[in-house]
Curated annotation (Swiss-Prot):
This is Small ribosomal subunit protein uS13. The keyword rRNA-binding applies. Residues 107-120 have a biased composition (Basic residues). The gene is rpsM. Keywords: Ribonucleoprotein, Ribosomal protein, RNA-binding, rRNA-binding, tRNA-binding. GO terms for molecular function: rRNA binding; structural constituent of ribosome; tRNA binding. Residues 93-120 are annotated as: Disordered. It comes from Helicobacter pylori (strain G27). Belongs to the universal ribosomal protein uS13 family.
Amino acid sequence: MARIAGVDLPKKKRVEYALTYIYGIGLKSSREILEAVGISFDKRVHELSEDEVSSIAKKIQQSYLVEGDLRKKVQMDIKSLMDLGNYRGIRHRKGLPVRGQTTKNNARTRKGKKKTVGSK
């Protein structure tokens, strides 16, 4: 089993799809990586040699922000929005939808379980 960026890639999958198991790499990025390294898209992970795995890992390390570093960057970006106190930061702080969705009826995922107000 190939291990790249701390992620075990599934053996039987094609390399272009297996690379998408790494947080921060989608299908387009994985194809760009394989093209740059010169590996066929049709190759399966268990068919890769150690040299090919190391060249893929090297390309990812020097060109992409993945896994823990990317998660940390996203968290820091959200934290900076909240510290600035702008509209998006306030929405993040309150746990409401950030991108303009209305909250009159839905937004249950973001707002959580409904809090009922007791009546007499």
